[in-house]
């Protein structure tokens, strides 16, 4: 491993940690706001990140819980995604990159990324439907943008995971031959 490669991996690990901490703070704030709003609905006018869902809550509590559930679940999935990325980067051995752990982590990252994408696409479609019924949904789009991009990224990561699985098979065959 060259000096530059080691530096790049350390840099990526730091960036992944920063993103992970940020996403965890966002998820925690959303969860705390949600629980607090159950006891005090007046808080709904000023949720995390200036999100105002008070009108939605007054129109339909079911829709409010559904939409907030999507917001929380997508945020939580993003936290899981970056946690898995951190585990992968911290345990990756570039001298022997084809290991069961790396293959498992890449496969898991693919599944979590696909879950984010599918959840985002479903949430987008639900928001389109409820906007036609008179709900104000303008401020919700930032919580599930790029669902299609996450699905495409999951497909690419799945291909990489498949290549790693094949690499492990070839490596074990090679070890048996020697």
Which residues does each predicted region cover?
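Cytoplasmic juxtamembrane regions at transmembrane-helix boundaries
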Residues: 2-8, 81-105, 176-178
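Hydrophobic alpha-helical transmembrane segments of integral membrane proteins
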Residues: 95-127
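Alpha-helical transmembrane segments of multi-pass integral membrane proteins
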Residues: 3, 114-178
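Transmembrane helix-loop junctions in multipass membrane proteins, especially transporters and channels
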Residues: 34-45, 87-90, 128-137, 177
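Perimembrane loop-to-helix junctions flanking transmembrane segments
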Residues: 38-59
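Alpha-helical transmembrane segments of multi-pass membrane proteins
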Residues: 21-37, 124-125
């Amino acid at each position: 491993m060259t000096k530059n490669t080691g530096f790049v991996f350390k840099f990526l690990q730091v960036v992944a940690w920063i993103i992970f901490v940020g996403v965890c703070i966002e998820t925690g704030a959303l969860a705390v706001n949600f629980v607090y709003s159950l006891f005090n609905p007046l808080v709904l006018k000023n949720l995390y990140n200036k999100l105002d869902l008070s009108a939605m809550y007054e129109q339909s509590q079911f829709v409010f819980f559904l939409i907030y559930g999507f917001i929380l679940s997508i945020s939580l999935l993003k936290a899981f995604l970056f946690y898995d990325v951190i585990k992968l980067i911290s345990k990756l051995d570039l001298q022997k990159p084809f290991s069961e752990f790396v293959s498992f982590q890449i496969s898991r990252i693919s599944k979590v990324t696909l879950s984010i994408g599918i959840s985002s696409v479903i949430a987008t479609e639900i928001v389109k439907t409820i906007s036609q019924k008179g709900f104000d949904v303008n401020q919700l789009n930032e919580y599930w943008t790029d669902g299609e991009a996450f699905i495409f990224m999951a497909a690419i990561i799945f291909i990489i995971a498949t290549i790693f699985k094949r690499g492990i098979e070839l490596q074990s065959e090679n070890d048996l031959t020697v």
